[in-house]
Amino acid sequence: MTMQDKEPSAPACRVIVITSGKGGVGKTTATANLGMCIARLGYRVALIDADIGLRNLDLLLGLENRVVYTAMEVIEGQCRLEQALIRDKRWKNLSMLAMSKNRQRYNMTRKNMMMIVDSIKERGYQYILIDCPAGIDAGFVNAIAPADEAILVTTPEITAIRDADRVAGLLEANDFYNVRLVANRVRPEMIQQNDMMSVDDVQGMIGVPLLGAIPEDKNVIISTNRGEPLVCQKTITLAGVAFEEAARRLVGLPSPSDSAPSRGWFAAIRRLWS
């Protein structure tokens, strides 16, 4: 049995919204890479691109040419959910659902969003990650409606941190008690020169537990242009290892960097946290 055939048991489907408030901080990149990592650990994962009319998740996964039907067509009765869920060819236990086609605007309601997620749950998926639209308008409210947990993505920049802190407050107001932080595009050399806030500083300002710290890495741009998640590249990268570490923490598995020696990849990841 291969790893992609093996499916660890999970007590219930976990629905996690990945949000940021501010656009351009790497939220969709985090969704694609965390989702791929969880699938590679053997779980059944569905990724939902909830950005109506401005989807990008399919590009990062290399699935843009396979989007024929979307969630809106499922809701309107034009196709079945199985037709809209696109199964990844690399890992069969990973699927993606686009909410709409680009340049199409629909009125996605909370009720419709809940219905779609409930239907995916019924098909045996163990993790559903929702890529939330940027901003805090109706798209945000609808995207968080079916979720039980949230991952807040930010960068160590004061504008992004302020927006992330605002979103953290909105999540708390909507009864989210399991919220974790991903600090993205961390640059250790700038932190050492006091030109960038440390990950500990970012976490302290926002006040939610830290799930992972992802270093700035040019390979993220390369992988995006190739339509392949960074964690699928043959070359090991520090950012890729950091995403894998965050995914292991998310599913409750031991993290190698937590007990890493003073040298090596995992030690480098651990140093990002401080």
From Swiss-Prot:
Biological process according to GO = cell division; negative regulation of cell division
* Keyword rRNA-binding (UniProt): no
Q: Which InterPro entries match?
A: CobQ/CobB/MinD/ParA_Nub-bd_dom (IPR002586), MinD (IPR010223), MinD_FleN (IPR025501), P-loop_NTPase (IPR027417), ParA/MinD_ATPase (IPR050625)
GO terms, molecular function: ATP binding; ATP hydrolysis activity
What SUPFAM superfamilies does the database record attribute to this sequence?
Answer: P-loop containing nucleoside triphosphate hydrolases
Name the Pfam families for this protein: CbiA
Parts of the chain that traverse the membrane = none
Q: What is a single cellular component term in the Gene Ontology annotation?
A: cytoplasmic side of plasma membrane
Q: Where in the cell is it found?
A: Plastid, Chloroplast
Q: Which domain of life is it from?
A: Eukaryota
> What keywords are assigned to this protein?
ATP-binding, Cell cycle, Cell division, Chloroplast, Nucleotide-binding, Plastid, Septation
Positions annotated to bind ATP: K22, G23, G24, V25, G26, K27, T28, T29
- Entry keyword Nucleotide-binding: yes
Q: Which family does it belong to?
A: Belongs to the ParA family. MinD subfamily.
Q: What does this protein do?
A: ATPase required for the correct placement of the division site.
> What protein is this chain from?
Putative septum site-determining protein MinD
Organism annotation: Nephroselmis olivacea
Q: Gene of origin? A: minD-A
